[in-house]
Design a protein with these regions (language model features):
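Bacterial N-terminal signal peptides that target proteins for export
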Residues: 1-7
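Short active-site neighborhood of thiol/selenol oxidoreductases, capturing the structured segment around
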Residues: 39-57
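Structural microenvironment flanking redox-active thiols in thiol-disulfide oxidoreductases
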Residues: 60-98, 108-115
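Short, internal strand/loop/helix patches
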Residues: 95-133
Length: 161
């Protein structure tokens, strides 16, 4: 069996392992680009949380569509690089093309990789849709399709245009 034939199995196991709909997102404390602390409790909700990496080809393909949704809906998209080599400078440079995304960066308390581990993320990109109570409504391992993401935002209580 080739390594590519195992990919669906890995994705299924990853989805089974990750936070599930109905579960509260874990506590974290990361910094926004201005140095303000963002926690699970303080983030604006409903929201979308995307775990990504600068080298990830699926992330590169997906981000323009996600950014359009962020622009159209006004829903906050928090993006967290789970890649240890993605420094603050790399993340902020990458995010210049996506001004509606709010990148979250390492703080004195947490590193993005630690937060990804609490969400039980096993790859890139992983997208979580969170409702006003901070509970996961939907998660996507890999690309999040536009219609599915908009449906999840409606389930999260988002007031879409």
């Amino acid at each position: 069996m080739g390594k590519w034939s195992l990919l669906p199995l890995v994705l299924l196991l990853g989805l089974a392992f990750a936070l599930q709909p109905g579960q509260a997102i874990p506590d974290f404390a990361l910094l926004d680009p201005q140095g303000r602390t963002v926690t699970a409790a303080s983030m604006r909700k409903p929201a979308v949380i995307v775990f990504w990496a600068s080298w990830c080809p699926v992330c590169r393909e997906e981000f323009p569509g996600l950014h359009r949704i962020a622009e159209e809906t006004g829903i906050p998209f928090y993006v967290i690089s789970a890649e240890p080599r993605d420094t603050r400078e790399v993340v902020l440079d990458y995010m210049r093309a996506y001004p509606r995304f709010l990148p979250l960066l390492a703080s004195d308390r947490d590193r993005p990789q630690q937060v990804a581990a609490r969400f039980r993320v096993l790859g890139h990109p992983w997208t979580f849709v969170v409702d006003a109570e901070g509970k996961v409504v939907a998660l996507f391992a890999g690309r999040a399709g536009r219609e599915a993401l908009l449906d999840a935002l409606l389930l999260a209580g988002a007031d879409l245009p």
